[in-house]
Amino acid sequence: MTELTVNQPLNYRNTGFITSAPDIRHLPQDTGVEIAFAGRSNAGKSSALNRITDQKGLARTSKTPGRTQLINMFEVTQGCNLIDLPGYGFAQVPLELKIKWQKALGEYLQKRECLKGLVVLMDIRHPMKDLDQQMIFWAIESRLPVLVLLTKADKMKSGARKAQLLKVRESSKSFGGDVQIELFSSLKGIGLDQVRRKLDTWFGPELERQLMLAAAENGETYTGESLSDKSDD
């Protein structure tokens, strides 16, 4: 009997780069499940992706914030992709380019059908800037769940970061929608397991869909927990 399960956590160490695109029109086919990562240019987005996948060089970190202008796609497993969106809000980027990026980000959040969750990263010392809030509003308008990561949590002492977490959680209630706030540190691994569990939850329906297709192709019955061969009944 062949047994397949949807409950086992994904191995994010297997994540690999697929492609880069200047906008939504140049992305691969709109299928599977995508989880997007967004944040200001100095929020530590690339470092977070590298820590989540346990790969130091997966997402390129730049010493010049605002340099990454492309949408970068990474595959965790078939049909499950992580999307690294261009950083926003860096002062030295020309206004015309800022407007172009913001338009591309809004278009992606509102029109990409396979997008099923948004991770917004914010420096814990400077959370909820105007553009951060705009990203969350766009997601809510598109009925997307949002995970806000207060990055660089190691920069604050334990008591101070807990107080900041509670403060941001309280202020986020005004958004409505599904918005979860958590602490995160790429350096210390704070919040790492929580992020991976959330990603597993968001990817779950796609993995279940694949199991159902595999069951049909192999003459098996999908029970919701595993696939059991009919011939063994």
Curated annotation (Swiss-Prot):
Residue sites binding Mg(2+) per the record: S46, T68
Record domain EngB-type G: where: 31-205
Cofactor section: Mg(2+)
Residues that hold GTP according to the record: 39-46, 66-70, 84-87, 151-154, 184-186
One GO CC annotation: cytosol
Source taxon at top rank: Bacteria
GO biological process, one term: division septum assembly
CDD domains xrefs: YihA_EngB
Entries under PROSITE patterns matching the protein: G_ENGB (PS51706)
Keyword Transmembrane tagged: no
SUPFAM superfamilies: P-loop containing nucleoside triphosphate hydrolases (SSF52540)
Keywords per UniProt: Cell cycle, Cell division, GTP-binding, Magnesium, Metal-binding, Nucleotide-binding, Septation
Function: Necessary for normal cell division and for the maintenance of normal septation.
The family this protein is said to belong to: Belongs to the TRAFAC class TrmE-Era-EngA-EngB-Septin-like GTPase superfamily. EngB GTPase family.
Name of the protein this chain belongs to: Probable GTP-binding protein EngB
